[in-house]
């Protein structure tokens, strides 16, 4: 049996995230569901697609990685052409490879990079409205960079997740947080070994509050130590977030 690795981009605007919903009678549209239906039709097999991780409803992805097992004898070129012909325009497979039998898109990930985009112009950019959070008030980038330093390293990020399970570890490592600003469009790239539910969006929401002067940069350390979701800020909107890169 072959193990096929695919890399894809998707605009998450119309989807309820990556992962398919298993409720009976559910008509929820997800990226995984769209792909599995095309692959099942192509191979006449019940394909189960393994994704590199979940993305929230409305979140986008570039270079998302998934894999699936198949007995199909189609060439890689035939497979990618078929998939892209039948997928909607907001999902596109960009690369396909034969993977080792043991390759697992989720469990083999060493780190992930997310990018969050903020439109900090007074008036919303029409062409970025689906891909950037419009924050009209001018942000203090220096304060945000100072606050971000407290998030670097290994911490218990319980304050920065919507996850309510008491059995799951909330310990994660943030390797880097980079800020890039150009014409009032701010990009925040966050690399870590893994992320909890809503973690990046809550981190960004908190950093924006620092940038607006609502909280001091050093208060982020207090938020981490509190281990209480209520201490952190509201999560940033989903549409500004994009899963950007994976390291295996």
Curated annotation (Swiss-Prot):
Keyword field: Isomerase, tRNA processing
A Pfam family matched in the record: PseudoU_synth_1
Nucleus keyword on record: no
EC numbers for this chain: 5.4.99.12
Residues noted as binding substrate in the record, renumbered to the chain: 114
TM helices/strands, residue ranges: none
Gene3D superfamilies: Pseudouridine synthase I, catalytic domain, C-terminal subdomain, Pseudouridine synthase I, catalytic domain, N-terminal subdomain
CDD domains the UniProt entry points to: PseudoU_synth_EcTruA
GO molecular function: RNA binding; tRNA pseudouridine(38-40) synthase activity
Catalytic activity: uridine(38/39/40) in tRNA = pseudouridine(38/39/40) in tRNA
Active site: 56 (nucleophile)
GO process terms (BP): tRNA pseudouridine synthesis
Broad EC category: isomerase
SUPFAM superfamilies, per database record: Pseudouridine synthase
Subunit structure: Homodimer.
Function recorded in the entry: Formation of pseudouridine at positions 38, 39 and 40 in the anticodon stem and loop of transfer RNAs.
Similarity annotation: Belongs to the tRNA pseudouridine synthase TruA family.
Name of the protein in its database record: tRNA pseudouridine synthase A 1
Native source species: Clostridium perfringens (strain 13 / Type A)
